[in-house]
Every structure is written in C-alpha cells, then in structure tokens.
Amino acid sequence: MHPKEIVRTGYNKIASRYTAKRVADSEDVQLLDLLVKRLPKQAMLLDAGCGSGYPITQFLEQFFRVTGVDFANQQLRLARTRLPGSTFVKADICRMPFKNDVFDAVCSYYAIIHVPRREQSRLLIDFLRILKMDGLALLCMGAGDIPDDTADYQGTEMFWSHYDKETNLRMVKESGFNILWSKVVKDPIDAHAAHLFVLGQKG
C-alpha cells in the first residue's frame, strides 16, 4: 500500500479514538499563541492536515477565518460536524487547490511527519506559495531521523518519515522561510515521542 493510503486508511479507522485522546491545554496547543499574537483578528489561516479539527482548528477559529484541509473522510466528517464555522476541503496537503498569496498563515500539526521526507521540501515550498508576503507558518516536523517507516499506532498501521532537527531547520530555510522560533516539544499522546515546532515567515 502507498504510504499516503496507509495514513489515510489509518486515520479514518481511528478518527474518533484519536480525537478523544487529544487535549485542549497541551503545550502544542498553547504554541498557537505564537500566531494569535502576530496576526490580526479574522486573518485568513490554513490548517493543513486538520484531521477532526480538535483541538487545533477549534482553537484557531476563535480568532481567525480558518480553512482546514485533510484527505481522511472520517476525520473531515467529525470536523464539519464539530466546527460549522470553519471551511473544510478534502485534499492531499501535497496537492492543495489554492491560488498564490491567499493565506496570512499556515498551521500544520502532525501531518508533515506522515509525508515521505523526500517530498517535504516541495510541500514547504507550496506552503510558501499560498502565503501572502510576510505570512507565517507554524509547522510540526520530526525531531529525529526516521526513514520511511511503518508501525502500529493505536491499533492500526501508520507511516512516518522525517529528518532530524537540524536537517529540518535547514530545509525550512532552504525552502524560503525566515525562521523566527523553534522548539522540540513532547508529544501530548505518546510519551516516547517529540516533535520539532518551527515558526517561519515568508519574506
């Protein structure tokens, strides 16, 4: 099975269970204040790989006009039911149907790590394309070196792929972003995992 189909099938299977494990006061959610403090009210924001919309889209829509993108039907069904105030689009984040210079910010949590790492640079360049000048990107990336790998995740097969922290920071810069901030943060669900969060800016 293609890696993207593994991810799509897996998240469809565990949609409700995964959502139930997420919490609204974890450190990763608190990092969204990095966007709130820098963007005007009602800015246009893309949540790339939004899943069920909880808790990330739900937090963001208090401040911004949010469009969520995901390719897992069950996740989107939950998102549309929970959050009728936001717009949701079914699409692969590596092939998003948006024009250039549309969004004030892109937020992507726990999605880039499921994209084959050889494709991640192109994804970052596409994020840059759809951002307005000086637009922000808050990205969750890998903190350790994991070549394409599959393993059990909450009872289903899942795919991961990412570079180490320093390689990812270099990739963000080489994609055209200025790095404003970065930090490695523990996964709120898996105590053995940690992720690199990066705030980048177009310009």
What are these regions (language model features)?
Residues 46, 52-95:
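Class I SAM-dependent methyltransferase SAM/SAH-binding core
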Residues 1-40, 145:
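Conserved class I S-adenosyl-L-methionine
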Residues 134-141:
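Conserved beta-strand signature within the Rossmann-like core of class I S-adenosyl-L-methionine
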Residues 94-106:
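A short acidic, Gly/Pro-enriched loop at the edge of an enzyme's catalytic core
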Residues 188-203:
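Core SAM-dependent methyltransferase catalytic element
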Residues 121-133:
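A short glycine-rich, Lys/Arg-flanked "PGG" loop and its adjoining helix->strand segment in the class I
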Residues 160-176:
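Short alpha-helix
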Residues 142-159:
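Short, glycine-/aromatic-enriched active-site segment of Class I SAM-dependent methyltransferases
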